[in-house]
Amino acid sequence: MDKLSGISSSSLPYKGMFSLLSIADKKHADSIYNPHVNGGFLLTNILQKCNISKVYGQEANLGKYKFDLMNLVINGADFKEIHIDQGNCITSPKFFNERFDVVLSEIPSSIIYDMNSKDRSFFTKLYDVEKFKRNLRRSEFPFIIHMLHQLKDDGVMAVLVRQNMLFRTFDEDIRECLINEKNYLDTVILLSGKLLRHSFDNFSILIFKKNRSSKDIFFIDASKDFDDKLTDENIEKIADAYASKKVIDKFSYLAGIDEIRENDYNLTVSRYIDTFEEDTVDLNEVLSKKVRLDKKLGGINEDIDYWLNELDLYD
């Protein structure tokens, strides 16, 4: 269990969808990187679905680091091709000069929020954060910047995020940079918070690519169709929509950059997909119910008249 994200490590359908989306465009990927290995469950799941030979990752927690290695080997990874290092990927990146075909992760809040002023200064200089037109604040974006740095130009990246980073006002500048200037964000997928053990707040998976030719962003709202469980059919529906970029009423939508700009780069899925269901009224059923109620009311009135006469209460 990831105590920070609340995601069950045994939630294989969720893990399966996450990994499936991250490799959808990289069926012949050679390398994969996870900056927050956290038990290795995402990595082992993706290795079962795709023949990726080189596995890279970091784990800040020393105890988990040893478990990560063991779990990967038990699940069939080649020990000689496993490159997992212990350390904080933000302040002590072990693979800074490497680039990977697939980069995927959940965001551990402790890595972000434990940064002191020295760490922030180091990170700002190392990653040239000023090009993103922002100062570091309490935000998930340093982690995302790190992941993008490690991604190949033709690679694909998937990251799980909380909803608030999609609309926070103080993060609008970096969203604008990643969307409009860099054109990295490809897809936003909203999922139900009931997939998480310790939260009912919805969350999203963001898909990034560096070699995009279009500035459109694809939105999928899977928060209502799939509640606290994802079946293989659910995953297939999401993956098919993602691969085809097909617009489906109340489920998926392709938004242009002008529309996103008009929304101040707010990425909340409900801004783009209307899932409101109007109540339908069966007039025949309503009329039938009215007849039944009128009949019942008539019987009650007859009873009242009877007792009023019996008790001689009429004027």
Where are these regions (language model features)?
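Short amphipathic alpha-helices and their capping/turn segments at secondary-structure boundaries
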Residues: 26-32, 86-103
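S-adenosyl-L-methionine
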Residues: 67-97
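Short, surface-exposed basic-aromatic patches at helix termini and helix-loop junctions that form
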Residues: 25, 47-50, 73-77, 175-182
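A conserved structural/catalytic subdomain of Rossmann-like adenosyl-cofactor enzymes
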Residues: 97, 101-315
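General small-molecule cofactor/ligand-binding pocket signal
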Residues: 56, 83-85, 189, 220
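Class I S-adenosyl-L-methionine
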Residues: 1-58, 64
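Conserved short loop/turn motifs at secondary-structure junctions
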Residues: 4-8, 56-61, 86-92, 161-166, ...
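Well-ordered alpha-helical segments embedded in enzymatic catalytic cores
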Residues: 15-19, 67, 142-146
